[in-house]
Amino acid sequence: MRISGTMASLAGLEQAIEEQDEEQKELAIRRMLLLHGITLSIGGIPLLYLGEEWGTLNDYDFTKDPAKAGDSRWIHRPRMRWEYLEELDDHIESGSGSIGQRVFKSIRQLINLRKSLPALAGQEMDLVATSNDHVLGYIRIYEGHRLIVFANFSEHPQVIDGNKLR
């Protein structure tokens, strides 16, 4: 079985929008930003796939093309929709706006944070045992700078034992 889809749809945003569920929209956005935060902090060269910067949903148009209909990977290979960028340009600084604008601004903040933290400049990354199945922990160290990251993959607050982190 192959799992295909855009990050936003796989994170639950598409379903939350269809169901007009504000709480689930918020959780989906938080899941997306968690994944982007990890991508930008864990090491290596981060990659944003087409449309992730504003939360593009699955594109089902591929099912209309017989040459593509049998390949579910086309669901996350949308045509570029330039009107999304125009909407971002019009409203990005206003503080209000769409889900796409919020995601875009948040990713921009994460990128700026990555640039400002010297510990993220190097390539060294060590996992931290959190003793909690919901929490991923890792440490980044570079030229005397140190950063520890904890990522909670649950929708609920989690506890880790600080004594085990020494």
What are these regions (language model features)?
Residues M1-R166:
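Active-site and adjacent substrate-binding regions of carbohydrate-active enzymes
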